[in-house]
Design a protein with these regions (language model features):
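Single conserved hydrophobic/aromatic residue that forms the stacking wall/gate
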Residues: 1-7, 11
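Phosphate-binding and adjacent anionic-ligand microenvironments
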Residues: 17, 40-197
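Residue-level "hotspot" positions that anchor or transmit function at local structural transition points
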Residues: 2, 22-25, 104
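Short Gly/Thr/Asp-enriched flexible loops that form oxyanion-binding sites at enzyme active sites
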Residues: 13-29
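Structural motif
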Residues: 28-44
Length: 197
């Protein structure tokens, strides 16, 4: 689906590209729609539901906008469960699976595209303008193949290395180590304000 007037395109699982060619992730969409709902007084419980993989910059932007957030395990099923249990209307993943619980129980690319067009039309702004106020932190994700995911995370040397990185990042970034739910992998994600740690 494309919007000729804005030269923007929304495709597949809510992947958007703004008029400048920048990829708009699920985190951007959560920011745009969460902010829009808050401005209209319709953000239930003042909360947007995310997963632990959402970008650190999203949380900083939410804090600046006075928008609350919840973090679930990775997977839209966990996002939806939290939304149902806590009466939230918007949630999703960085990957672009965005759930509007009033209309669907899972991500829907067409619905998300329509919702983004709704905001653009109501605010009379381009996608890039709607993203103002959100600075996405550089994020690096590495996978480590292991035979025992739990043992790898519990290893004293691994824990010491994770703590050292977390300490060096302080409040300006984070490190997240988690087991893959589908493969014999431990995933390590690091975010910081700059590419250099």
């Amino acid at each position: 689906l494309s919007i000729r007037r804005q030269r923007q395109m929304c495709i597949r699982d809510s992947l958007c590209v703004d008029e400048k060619g920048n990829v708009i992730t699920g985190d951007h969409i959560l920011y745009i729609y969460g902010r829009y709902m808050k401005e209209r007084g319709k953000l239930e419980n003042n909360t947007v539901v995310t997963t632990v993989m959402s970008n650190f910059g999203l949380y900083k932007a939410f804090d600046e906008q006075g928008i609350g957030y919840a973090k679930t395990a990775v997977g839209d099923k966990y996002v939806y469960e939290y939304m149902c249990e806590n009466g939230c209307r918007i949630g999703g993943e960085q990957s672009g699976h965005i759930i509007f619980s009033r209309y669907a129980s899972t991500g829907d690319g067409i619905l998300t595209s329509l919702k983004m067009m709704e905001v653009m039309m109501a605010k009379k702004k381009k996608m890039s303008e709607l993203c103002e106020g959100l600075s996405i932190y550089p994020q690096v994700l590495r996978n480590a193949r292991v035979t025992d995911k739990r043992a790898a995370q519990d290893d004293a040397d691994v824990q010491a290395a994770v703590k050292a990185v977390a300490d060096s990042l302080g409040d300006s970034g984070r490190i997240l180590v988690r087991e893959s739910g589908t493969e014999p992998l431990v995933r390590v994600m690091v975010e910081a304000e700059t590419d250099e740690i």
